[in-house]
Amino acid sequence: TLTLYAGAAPAMVRSGGGGNIVDYTPAVAETPETWSVSNAAEFGFSAIGTDVPTGTWGTDADCIAGADVPSTTLKWRDFDLTGSADQIATSASQTTMAGTSATMCVATQQASVFAASGSYTATITATATAL
């Protein structure tokens, strides 16, 4: 099982405080959906890979649809609001010594809104555990 955990809420924090970028706001919290941001700056994530369920995360081989455009066939969501880890991949069988591929995709989109200038950091911890 592969999980992700955001070290802050919101996940994308502006250095020096203030002006943080809010987590993506899907129609149903913590439920992946097609990326849709209107008049806001938001930060969300998706996943692709061998053991990443496409029913949950969508289907694409790349994180982006084009320059600065999140994939339109992946499903995106916010980080867990309760502070627990988010599962992105799992396998019922043992992987080979080479392992399997899993990629966390991130998107930050501004639609008619400008984020405050400065440096931003998102600390995301990925944890792989044996079932």
Regions of interest found by a model, annotated:
Residues 1-131:
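Signature of Gram-negative chaperone-usher
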